[in-house]
């Protein structure tokens, strides 16, 4: 049995360590008080929101994590840029913002033209899918600090104030809709790598694909689907299911969720069969659901019809009055 903390990623320890940084960061809000770009303290969750009159500028930052180690191990770099862009633009969507632009940060041990070209191809494809411009970035060559490379980015989006989605409108009875993920996306890779690679090797064949192909499958970009949803349906909440798995739903509301998740398939089944506890699976991985939308019950069918034109989507369940997340078909509560 292996947990995320045992694999080296202790979320509780990280949260405790971050408290001082978060406290000081919030203290800087006063430096923009009464000025253009004043932070909207009570609104941002997946992305911070800054006041620009009739609209908010949304901003978020994220990286690819240890997925880059798999790319390095097999020498395939042309999808990792898609992952980085996906991690950022999908977060912007969760406050109702349309992603607009991104700057990247690439830290390397030494420059390599082939690696850079592959990363650039992925960044271009990710930008194309998201409909954004890459307007700048930083490349840091640090042989004394970096072994390999790290890729991260910061993205901005815009949203009219009246269209901001915060989760405050969520009420018991609302429908919870899941949009299918492409696989593991960019979270839980440390656990997956340490559990599977030593035992099987990256070329291990599982259900018609090599292990490295399962691990490197690009994170799905939901921009077109979600923007169309927002335009046509009343959306009460949006959650990008990333680090923390289904616990991300708690970021939206104090109400609870009663849901049924899809069957455990693909890479998730392989991980589960190798000893990760069921509750830990739902706390770490997206488990086949990359994005969740919460909509009024009466708009559920229209939302499903619209989303299924882009990606396979399905009703997961409903919002309930009791706090917590109940995964009914697996008998667990988070």
From Swiss-Prot:
One of its GO terms (cellular component) is cytosol. SUPFAM superfamilies: PurM C-terminal domain-like, PurM N-terminal domain-like. GO terms for molecular function: ATP binding; phosphoribosylamine-glycine ligase activity; phosphoribosylformylglycinamidine cyclo-ligase activity. One of its GO terms (biological process) is adenine biosynthetic process. It is found in: Cytoplasm. It catalyses: 2-formamido-N(1)-(5-O-phospho-beta-D-ribosyl)acetamidine + ATP = 5-amino-1-(5-phospho-beta-D-ribosyl)imidazole + ADP + phosphate + H(+). Pathway: Purine metabolism; IMP biosynthesis via de novo pathway; 5-amino-1-(5-phospho-D-ribosyl)imidazole from N(2)-formyl-N(1)-(5-phospho-D-ribosyl)glycinamide: step 2/2. Keywords: ATP-binding, Cytoplasm, Ligase, Nucleotide-binding, Purine biosynthesis. Its EC number is 6.3.3.1. InterPro entries: PurM-like_C_dom, PurM-like_C_sf, PurM-like_N, PurM-like_N_sf, PurM_cligase. PANTHER family: TRIFUNCTIONAL PURINE BIOSYNTHETIC PROTEIN ADENOSINE-3 (PTHR10520:SF12), TRIFUNCTIONAL PURINE BIOSYNTHETIC PROTEIN ADENOSINE-3-RELATED (PTHR10520). Belongs to the AIR synthase family. This is Phosphoribosylformylglycinamidine cyclo-ligase. It comes from Thermococcus kodakarensis (strain ATCC BAA-918 / JCM 12380 / KOD1) (Pyrococcus kodakaraensis (strain KOD1)).
